[in-house]
Structure formats: structure tokens, C-alpha cells
Amino acid sequence: MNKDQASGNWKQFKGKAKEQWGKLTDDDLTVIEGKRDQLVGRIQERYGYEKEAAEKEVKHWEDHHKYHW
């Protein structure tokens, strides 16, 4: 998948990410812009999770929504 496809996917799914993690701000979602590591980092930051817990949440979200980076 190229960068444009990933960016398009993210635009489609960022509302679902906001529903899942309501503490993420619009600025957070802009910074994340389809980058998995950024999503994990922002979840850690906003929710005080360890990296492993944030990774697990993101993995569950990816599986549930069939999201591909």
C-alpha cells in the first residue's frame, strides 16, 4: 500500500479512532495521520498506558475495524 492509500484509509477511519479513544484531540489525529507508532504513542500519552497496553488496544481496534496501515 502506498502512502496516499494509507492516508486515505486514515481519513476514513480517524472518526472511529476518535470514538474508541475520546481523549485523542483533533490535533493528535492530525499528527497521527495514518502512522501506527504515532497512534500508539498518543494513546500512551493521553491514557497513561504502558506501551504494551497501548499496542494491545490498537491491535484489537485494527482487528475489529479491519484497518490496514
UniProtKB/Swiss-Prot annotation:
Spell out the Pfam families in the cross-references: CsbD
Q: What is this protein called?
A: UPF0337 protein ECA0631
Q: Which family does it belong to?
A: Belongs to the UPF0337 (CsbD) family.
Q: Which cysteine-cysteine pairs are annotated as disulfide bonds in the entry?
A: none
Q: From which domain of life does this come?
A: Bacteria
The record ties this protein, via InterPro entries, to: CsbD, UPF0337_stress_rsp, YjbJ, YjbJ_sf
Task: Please tell me the species this chain comes from.
Answer: Pectobacterium atrosepticum (strain SCRI 1043 / ATCC BAA-672) (Erwinia carotovora subsp. atroseptica)
